[in-house]
A protein has these predicted regions:
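Active-site bordering "gate/hinge" segments
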Residues: 1-119, 134, 144, 149-163
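Dual-mode signal for accessory low-complexity, basic/Gly-rich regions
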Residues: 109, 125-192
């Protein structure tokens, strides 16, 4: 019932000290949650070439600021995040991971650009000649559910018959693990 939970990220103690939660971060996150709830769309661009369009109609928006005071809630520290869970099929465009960005999966800074093409929530292409793009492609290919063409592109379309529809349904569920689940951004001044 009244339990409050705080998940502490596996960060260096210096980062935790630098990213202490405060009332100002809480107010900023709550303001941005309201903005996300009131928006119909979000566009993300960058000098590196990112041009991502996210439909927000019907999206669930939330966030966290690194501490919790209400019973029955969970947060994580460091905090300071506003995010949205958009409807299926509403994320499209190009996302470029540029040198200096962090790839949390590999716990490393990106050294050479990776360009991801996203269509209806799915990464349909991973471009880049450097080690970072190679690591991303091999990581996704290692799961063995994208076929010889590389990463899973989109749920397969049934070709007819109940067996084909059942196989497509199973394949679609498996590939949904690769779809965009949420989009968000940080608001913690100490992280800048």
């Amino acid at each position: 019932g009244g339990t409050r939970v705080i998940y502490i990220s596996n960060e260096h103690p210096e980062a935790l000290v630098r990213l202490m939660p405060d009332d100002a971060t809480e107010a900023r996150v709550k303001d941005h949650i309201k903005r996300l709830r009131g928006a119909k769309a979000m566009t993300v661009t960058s000098p590196a070439g990112t041009d991502l369009r996210i439909g927000l109609e019907g999206a669930v928006a939330g966030g966290n600021w690194g501490f919790t005071t209400r019973p029955g809630t969970l947060t994580h520290w460091p905090g300071g995040i506003a995010l949205a869970f958009p409807a299926a099929g509403s994320v499209n465009g190009t996302l470029v991971l540029a040198p200096g960005d962090v790839n949390l999966t590999f716990k490393r800074y990106v050294e050479s650009a990776i360009t991801l093409t996203i269509e209806n929530d799915y990464v349909t292409a991973i471009e880049g000649d450097g080690l970072d793009a190679q690591l991303m492609r091999s990581y996704i290919e290692a799961w063995g559910d994208g076929g010889s063409d590389g990463p899973p592109l989109a749920p397969p379309a049934p070709s007819g018959g109940s067996d084909a529809r059942a196989a497509a349904s199973v394949g679609a569920r498996g590939r949904d693990a690769y779809a965009v689940s949420h989009v968000g951004y940080g608001l913690c001044d100490g992280a800048r």
